[in-house]
Amino acid sequence: MIQKNYPTKQGFITYWINASKIPSKPWLVFLPGLTANHHLFKDQLEHFKGKANLLVWDPPSHGKSRPFDTTWTIGQLAEWLNNLLESESISNPVLVGQSMGGYISQAFMERFPRKTLAFISIDSAPLGRSHYRTWELWGLKHTFLVYIGLPWQLILWSGANGCAETAKGKLLMKRMMLDYRKMEYCKLVSHGYKELSREIEKNKTYRLECPTLLICGDKDRAGYTARYNQQWAKEESNPVCWVEGAGHNANSDNPTEVNLLIEAFLEQQHLI
């Protein structure tokens, strides 16, 4: 894969893409979660190499997509994603979003209907307002002081252990977090949560109108992700695939099972 940059007024978005495109194969577009980067999908990129065209980004203000003015909204992230894909002549992507990446995927599908070939959610949750209690949304807007008041080593420990269950998954998450200094991390995570809350409060209609695969770690303890997925599955009549022994970063905790689930789903949709 080759590294490229997409320019915006707020900074450059760094992404990685197939060195040579395969016209007969679908595009898998991998979107990491809040504070994570492209390394989160290392095992998926290796597994699907040659089976599909691949693109993964470091979200704005994350990883190599820095410096970047951290004033973006979820809607802007979706618009930049669309513009980036259009610049690469990618018209019908399969969006693979982990956590915040899944929210960006839904915002993309709402703003650009009928563009997405399929959606794979990994430990994400629905954007529909009905799934959230008022105090949960209030809490998402007031996290900065909570984070900044904690020692950096405690933030690193809680982030790694809260997102992953395996030693490999915890180490990966900690390494991604160490890409930031404490203040930068606290500003980024609190901004991401605040913008997520604001997007949910818009009370838009988010319907999954393309083939969808819901994946969630059976030990996901990040917020209320497990509960949200149960509600989401019921609302969409689309069962959740629970990944054994995996936490919030299910694709790094148990990449073998997640890769098999994704591959079986793509085969079922006659995409690979």
PLM feature spans:
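Flexible "cap/lid" loop of the alpha/beta hydrolase fold
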Residues: 110, 116-148
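Gly/Ala-rich beta-loop-alpha elbow adjacent to hydrolase catalytic centers
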Residues: 97-101, 105
